[in-house]
């Protein structure tokens, strides 16, 4: 049963690839735009220039079970990104259930493998992977955004059926929320994913994730992650802390 309870968490790593590679910001402002122009601008940003310099993030992971407090655990991981296609990690600290560290290692192993295999193209928010529909203009954390509906073109666990918040000024993705297009197991009724993004030292990164799985028989389980710290290549190699990534935007 423990294997069943943790299997869904691999999805979180695959979905996280949507934003695991930061993009250099282009904050060009646009006037009133048509729906197609919004999607065009979003796609241009998705395919924008990737960071050339290596960087490191410190992530905090929390695993919890709504009906099972013994599943609760807390893990801190150090993740190194080396463009164009290299990722490695180290677990810094782990407490609570040993299941937490096992799950986080599976998540990060999947991320490392997907990075080296170039699989991130299959999760990009573009017309190759999704059909879009315009919902309206909204404000998210004080930022004006276009809210678009997402309908995956394929039934794959790496794609999300839901909504995307696109920054009205930069056309970068600020948030994605929805259910995975396909669950990898009969044991999983559904998996809901929420991803958040923000600027860290001029690079647009996925800063948080919440994945909630409705597991048959044993009930819901939740995995969350957030960036605690971001370090440039020079700072990471010296071991000096540069800044916290969970500041208010």
Locate each region found by the language model:
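Bacterial N-terminal signal peptides that target proteins for export
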Residues: 1-13
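Composition- and surface-driven signal marking solvent-exposed, interaction-prone regions
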Residues: 14, 161-163, 177-179
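Hydrophobic h-region of N-terminal signal peptides that target proteins for export
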Residues: 14-24
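Structured extracytoplasmic
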Residues: 25-161, 168-172, 181-191, 203, ...
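Beta-strand-dense domains in secreted/periplasmic systems and polymorphic toxin scaffolds
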Residues: 176, 207-209
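A short pocket-lining beta-strand/turn micro-motif at the edge of beta-sheets
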Residues: 193, 200-207
């Amino acid at each position: 049963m423990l294997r069943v309870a943790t299997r869904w968490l691999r999805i979180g790593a695959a979905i996280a690839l949507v934003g695991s590679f930061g993009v250099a910001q282009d904050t060009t402002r646009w006037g009133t735009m048509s729906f197609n122009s919004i999607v065009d601008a979003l796609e241009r940003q998705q395919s924008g220039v990737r960071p050339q310099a290596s960087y490191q993030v410190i992530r905090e992971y929390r695993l919890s079970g709504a009906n099972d407090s013994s599943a609760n655990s807390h893990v801190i991981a150090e993740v190194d990104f080396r463009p164009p296609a290299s990722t490695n990690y180290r677990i810094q600290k782990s407490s609570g259930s040993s299941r937490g560290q096992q799950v986080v290692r599976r998540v990060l192993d999947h991320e490392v493998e997907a990075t080296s295999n170039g699989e991130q193209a299959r999760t990009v928010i573009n017309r190759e992977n999704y059909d879009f529909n315009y919902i309206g203009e909204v404000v998210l954390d004080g930022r004006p955004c276009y809210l678009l509906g997402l309908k995956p073109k394929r039934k794959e666990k790496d794609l999300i059926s839901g909504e995307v918040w696109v920054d009205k000024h930069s056309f970068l993705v600020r948030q994605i929320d929805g259910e995975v297009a396909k669950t990898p197991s009969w044991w999983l009724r559904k998996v809901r994913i929420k991803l958040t993004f923000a600027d860290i030292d001029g690079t647009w990164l996925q800063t948080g994730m919440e994945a909630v799985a409705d597991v048959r028989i044993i009930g819901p389980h939740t995995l969350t992650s957030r960036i605690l710290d971001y370090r440039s290549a020079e700072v990471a190699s010296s071991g000096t802390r540069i800044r916290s990534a969970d500041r208010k935007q």
